[in-house]
Amino acid sequence: MRKVAVRSSALIAMLIFLLGIATAHEGNEHATSVFGDLEFSQILTSIGLLISLAVYLTGLFRLWRIAGRGHGLGVAAAASFLAGWLSLTGALIGPLHDLSESLFSAHMTQHEILMLVSAPLIILGRPQIAAVWSLPVRWRKNVSVVTNNQNFEHIWQFVSGSFVAFLIHAAALWTWHIPMLFDATLENAWVHALQHASFFGTALLFWWAIINASLDWKSSFVGVLFLFLTSLHSGILGAFLTFTREIWYSVYANSTAAYGLTPLEDQQLGGLIMWVPAGLVYIGAGLAMFARVLSQTERRALDIDRRLQAAETANL
């Protein structure tokens, strides 16, 4: 019970912190800082990203110093987190971020990186463990007291269940592609912040549920189902954007010509990105999980056969 509670509380702490990163880069969309051409929002983003990395590395090295390198938190998990962190940094800072203000297709690429690259890699990095170990001992005890509360644990288990996480993530994806809301993201910095926080936060929750489902061979079938359902509904939205003959997002009406695209072509390209590459990620993850389930099932069957044969031999 205690292990589950600490694990869930640490994830929530990291989730909130990482949402702060997604939010920070929109804090002042058009402000120019005292540091020259670098936007103040980009400085906030950089600070948030560096703090998140420092938190993870502090917890990682503190744990390894006590338990030994690779124990408690494996090298592969640490590498996964770093890869996710780098992809998150690339999406929020630099050319892609700037281009996303002019092209819907670039904005879509940014969102897909957040949801399909950064989020699963960060969850595979097991940030909840590093987050707990980064805290002073007294704080760890306080966190444990809060999360050992049964009401808290029941709420977390409900929200992080595969079905609920799937619904929350799907709702965020479809809601923010309503034209009025999507246009508002480039017209209001706070709305843009909320959009990115919604996409990234619900993706973290979704991949947390899927990856944890994969740890149990029975729950893995549910995880596979929701991966394919996510591929289906996001693909439908992408197909709508690809085949429509109407411009959904007027905010890009005057910014695409400089890149040799009409607003409709840019929109269709964005839809294609959501439909095909993103869909392949979900399908690939689902197939990998299904293959793992089949392998586990086969091993279980062989183990049962060996036990039966051993029992028959013993009875002879």
Describe the residue ranges of each PLM region.
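Bacterial N-terminal signal peptides
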Residues: L11-F17
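Alpha-helical membrane segments of multi-pass proteins
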Residues: R2-S8, G20-L316
